[in-house]
């Protein structure tokens, strides 16, 4: 029941994607560099904590956000006043975290002259923040901006849909927007034949990949250690420094996963083990116009090549990436075969398996360091976290390559973005 209330914003009709100018690949298969490119300069994230019982259960979201804002600026030695705008993805904090995010800005030493907004597109909020900042750069509003995502699922009011018209009872799609996310996962599994065995196998792979990545130090470059305090049952405070994700379970086995009962529906196949974790965390991504980055001597970690959002039926919202990814690839002039890494959010194994199979993506290209089933899914943070993880992994590999970030979105949508790593 707890998961039924807290697993939000995830998950066959054919959605239409908007038309866009096609980018033309160069003869080597990569897009031509341009002074007007929107580039990713740098990105950092906090460790991801388990909501309500983990390392950040007593840490406010403004502190999590401040930690990554401060780290990104310090890492590249950028003066805070040089930021043209800040966009913060958030889902569950009051007012989409508008006040909380502005407080975090000031806690990070960023002056009041730098504007800030928050955005809530549910589980794609962090990626939408990236798109919003990129849009401001493209339209000439500024040359440098910060895109962030943050969520404290511990310190949030869940299960409150607010004031909604009674007319939703007359409209099937409107009613479907209130279907619990776990039930949408069951709908995907039943409608598209995703077995419990496949879901558990996908979940096991996520845990194994994350455990391997953690043991090899693959997350060190992206994680900002956070010093905070936790309270025990007696109210005593203890200061701790958190430097790695809490949700990774190296001892996970198929046998253990098979013992878990369905979390949302009698006879169902979605369990706590093959669903994303309820989590706390934050991430920040610094973007700039290529010409400005070069002028200031800033590094270029990646290039944003395209972004797309599509709509899908709300009752199977988890299929969103299966339609958003082709739309983003089309805008970039690329195909599935051109992509080295797909960071697809693991809201539920059911929908992730469906999307991977629908698009024919080789398993080795999907979430090579694990995903939300193992790492956790702080709703507003996830999209920004995925960008940071993707580009750091491409950097580790060292060669020029493309990667995709994608996720499903509660109420029936999917989002995807294509990034290029320029090579060492």
Curated annotation (Swiss-Prot):
PROSITE patterns: THIOLASE_1 (PS00098), THIOLASE_2 (PS00737), THIOLASE_3 (PS00099). The active site is at 123 (acyl-thioester intermediate), 408 (proton donor/acceptor). It is an enzyme of class 2 (transferase). It is found in: Peroxisome. Residues 1-26 form a transit peptide. Belongs to the thiolase-like superfamily. Thiolase family. Responsible for the thiolytic cleavage of straight chain 3-keto fatty acyl-CoAs (3-oxoacyl-CoAs). Plays an important role in fatty acid peroxisomal beta-oxidation. Catalyzes the cleavage of short, medium, long, and very long straight chain 3-oxoacyl-CoAs. This is 3-ketoacyl-CoA thiolase B, peroxisomal. It comes from Mus musculus (Mouse). The lineage of its organism: Eukaryota, Metazoa, Chordata, Craniata, Vertebrata. The gene is Acaa1b.
